[in-house]
Amino acid sequence: MTDLDRRWDLPSAPEDLLYQAAILSRFFPALAVHLRSSLGGLYLAAGSLAPDEARDFNARMDQDKSVLDLNYYRLLRLTGNLSLAADMDLPQDLPEEDRDIVEETELVCRETESLAKLLGLTLRFRCQEGRHLCALRRDAVRQLLLQLLSNAFKFTPAGGEITVALSSGNGWVHLTVTDNGPGIPPERKEHLFDRYLRADRNHIPPHGLGLGLPICRRIAEGHGGRIMAESQEGRGTRITVMLPDRQTGKLALADQPMDYGGDFNPTLLGLADVLPAEAFQKL
């Protein structure tokens, strides 16, 4: 095993931890800045070459532009995760306001239901409460849910089913995402939410760098909550996010603009790594 190979393995020694911490804290965020700057120029140029009004009458142009948009969104999503990698281990309380978590969760499910169908999947939302106010950061919880759905879509084969469920009790709100995919190997479960580079380095595409679930952990902990996984190989996976069932007294009067992806569609952005180009077509 070469030194480079060893560095991509799960950390087993102090020098491995320091090495990966340096990459995640310094190199990745700097790389994200340069990528985002270049991507912006590329996207504007592509929009000039294939404007929306022309795509309405040119199926080939529409298909070609959808492939470009898909890959652009994937890179933009990656740069967002790389930017967040620097401070995932730093304690941070997210600013919150009282919102209806049932409404917010159901909205994300409605937005992603048709995208799930493109992958041959069925997405269901289950909640016995019609309304439930609790303190949360709306854009962060949306990002968390989209990341969990992205993982479920990615690993569940066509014909599978994903269920998003909400419940409350004993001072907690439980948000679960359950799939009937292949499950998680036991050796990976221990490190599922760790902020480290993926061990299966030879299989990075299409599974990414493994930063998504650590970001979910950061969001849950930023709300004073926690996240956990249950999985059996061959029988699927359930991810549970527990958020404190409390209120701040600050009601959300209007939706605030979401800054995760600028002016881009946040739902497509959050699921870009699993979607087909068809999701970006106009025709």
Where are these regions (language model features)?
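Short helix-loop "hinge" at the ATP-lid/N-box region of the Bergerat-fold HATPase_c
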Residues: 152-153
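Short alpha-helical Gxxx[C/S/T] motif in the catalytic ATP-binding
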Residues: 212, 216
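Conserved catalytic submotifs in the C-terminal HATPase_c
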Residues: 97, 117, 122-132
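Short conserved segment of the HATPase_c
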Residues: 184-196
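Short alpha-helical segment of the dimerization/phosphotransfer core of two-component systems
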Residues: 70-75
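Conserved glycine-rich
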Residues: 224-225
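Acidic ATP/Mg2+-coordinating residue in the GHKL
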Residues: 179
